[in-house]
């Protein structure tokens, strides 16, 4: 498969950064460059970072910029090839055989209508129309990672009843990892890699203003300061960008309904903290945190 030297409408990392911004995703220069190179070189893009920094949103935005459908494969412990590739619709196959009665031996039960496509097979069959997102690959086991490595080597699978299916062009593949475990070095070598950090305060404020409609700049700045303080606390789950956006929206909504700003932030704390122990830990500290954030 030929390497892509150009991408329609995206001639540089800066052009991709601008296109992502138009799709309401604020990428920095490092991320837009990594994504551009992955697309141009025809290599998978591996995005690592803490939960909530925008890895999955980046994949969605890239698919939107390319005008393609996002095929999301959510990984979990115990995921296997059947969940990622395909299954046969056994009940429909049996129904088709029963309906034919004595002629059942002439029924082809391996036609497309009986094939249940999973994301990886769909990507192979329609690579020009899709972006494959393999989300949270670190949650899968080493066996699935080995299977994935083989898939990424030649973008081909074999269905015993149908033969080999190979992508006619190199698909766009994005992998994400929260780094709960180390990925195999061979998998990393096949990818263009980028680590997504928590955004700098000014950039996080711009993200909130872009994604949270109706939020005033003062409220956005207060959220950024308060969330930054929360991230320095020993919490089970530190708030990510999505929680910051939702907190800004929730506090603004309560303020519009008559709550004063500090109370609006205090009452909507469950939007930004999603763990009981974290709420208990922060409760006696929230007033000082809000005061420090100049709420």
What are the residue ranges of the model-derived segments?
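C-terminal regulatory/interaction module of P-loop NTP-utilizing enzymes
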Residues: 1-295
């Amino acid at each position: 498969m030929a390497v892509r030297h150009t991408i329609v409408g995206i001639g540089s990392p800066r052009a991709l950064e601008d296109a992502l911004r138009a799709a309401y995703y604020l990428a920095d220069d490092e991320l837009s460059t990594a994504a551009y190179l992955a697309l141009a070189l025809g290599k998978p893009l591996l995005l690592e970072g803490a939960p909530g920094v925008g890895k999955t949103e980046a994949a969605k935005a890239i698919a939107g910029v390319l005008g393609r459908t996002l095929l999301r494969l959510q990984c979990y412990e115990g995921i296997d090839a059947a969940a990622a590739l395909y299954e046969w619709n056994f009940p429909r196959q049996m129904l088709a055989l029963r309906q034919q009665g004595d002629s059942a031996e002439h029924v082809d039960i391996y036609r497309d209508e009986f094939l249940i496509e999973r994301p990886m097979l769909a990507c192979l069959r329609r690579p020009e129309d899709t972006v494959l997102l393999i989300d949270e690959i670190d949650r899968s086991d080493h066996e699935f990672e080995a299977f994935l490595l083989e898939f990424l080597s030649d973008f081909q699978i074999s269905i015993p009843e149908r033969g080999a299916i190979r992508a006619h062009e190199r698909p766009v593949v994005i992998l994400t990892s929260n780094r709960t475990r180390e990925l195999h070095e061979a998998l990393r070598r096949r990818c263009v890699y980028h680590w997504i950090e928590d955004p700098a305060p000014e950039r996080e404020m711009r993200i909130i203003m872009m994604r949270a409609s109706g939020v005033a700049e003062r409220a956005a700045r207060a959220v950024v300061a308060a969330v930054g303080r929360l991230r320095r606390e020993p919490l089970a789950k530190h708030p990510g960008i999505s929680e910051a956006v939702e907190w800004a929206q929730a506090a603004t909504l309560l303020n519009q309904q008559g709550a004063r700003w500090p109370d609006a932030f205090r009452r909507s704390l469950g939007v930004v903290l999603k763990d009981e122990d974290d709420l208990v830990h922060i409760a006696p500290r929230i007033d000082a945190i809000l005061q420090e954030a100049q709420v």
